[in-house]
């Protein structure tokens, strides 16, 4: 009597554990100040038509920082918004054989933010299991004619979609200077290993402490990933500029009563 076949193997899929965190940071000028401000606090700030809080003050959108300035002549800089950045999109693949180099010429920048990642990161075994993997990248600056490694990064985990992360480079060389991204991990030559790497963008950052005198502003930081890649819009419900009105005028009811005396 012949032997029966061996037990079949059910392929296992490890959970994706890499998640991009992309923060939208913006300062919106509301108008000439001083103004009274949002009608109902954070409920009067809407991202993609959704208020930041409900009527009881509980968060509807999480991971949000909002800073308000009314527009006085002397007002403090908005905390957490002490820098201004200009992003340059690249979207270029980085391979083992071809590091990617760019030249920075802006004379007044203080720091660089480099955004990079993987298109996907997963390794499939001969039995069909889909497991985490890793890839190593170097970020280098050219100093005195030599490439110097500023960041040595290993991305380790699993994702079936694009994953981006970023690092900040301080202590920059005199301008102009070259920056490059180097892939240390060998390129995949099979569909069983998906680990393509890309340099998404770089952002030139200037450290400033702007007070925006006589201008009412809102500084807003929000985790854009929770909106699934949608373009973000922000709306505000604001009580406007504070001005002098007749003594017999009720600005809430918008009515006059009695005799005007100043």
Feature names for model-found ranges:
Residues 1-262:
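Polar, S/T/G-rich
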């Amino acid at each position: 009597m012949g032997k029966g076949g061996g037990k079949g193997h059910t392929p296992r899929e490890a959970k994706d554990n890499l998640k991009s965190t992309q923060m939208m940071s913006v300062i919106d000028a509301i108008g000439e100040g001083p103004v009274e401000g949002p009608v109902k606090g954070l409920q009067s700030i809407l991202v993609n038509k959704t208020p930041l809080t409900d009527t009881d003050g509980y968060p509807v959108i999480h991971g949000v920082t909002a800073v308000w300035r009314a527009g006085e002549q002397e007002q403090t800089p908005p905390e957490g918004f002490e820098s201004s950045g200009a992003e340059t999109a690249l979207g270029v693949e980085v391979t083992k054989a071809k590091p990617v180099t760019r030249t920075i010429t802006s004379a007044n920048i203080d720091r660089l933010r480099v955004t990079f990642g993987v298109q996907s990161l997963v390794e499939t075994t001969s039995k069909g299991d889909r497991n985490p993997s890793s890839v190593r990248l170097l970020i280098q600056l050219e100093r005195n004619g030599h490439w110097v490694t500023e960041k040595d990064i290993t991305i380790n985990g699993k994702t079936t979609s694009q994953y981006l992360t970023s690092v900040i480079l301080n202590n920059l060389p005199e301008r102009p200077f070259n920056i490059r991204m180097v892939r240390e991990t060998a390129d995949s030559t099979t569909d069983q290993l998906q680990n393509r790497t890309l340099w998404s963008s770089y952002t030139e950052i200037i450290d400033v402490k702007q007070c925006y005198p006589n201008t009412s502003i809102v500084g807003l930081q929000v985790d854009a990933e929770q909106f699934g890649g949608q373009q973000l819009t922000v709306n505000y419900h604001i009580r406007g500029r504070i001005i002098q009105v007749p003594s017999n005028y009720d600005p809430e009811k918008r009515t006059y009563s009695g005799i005007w005396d100043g």
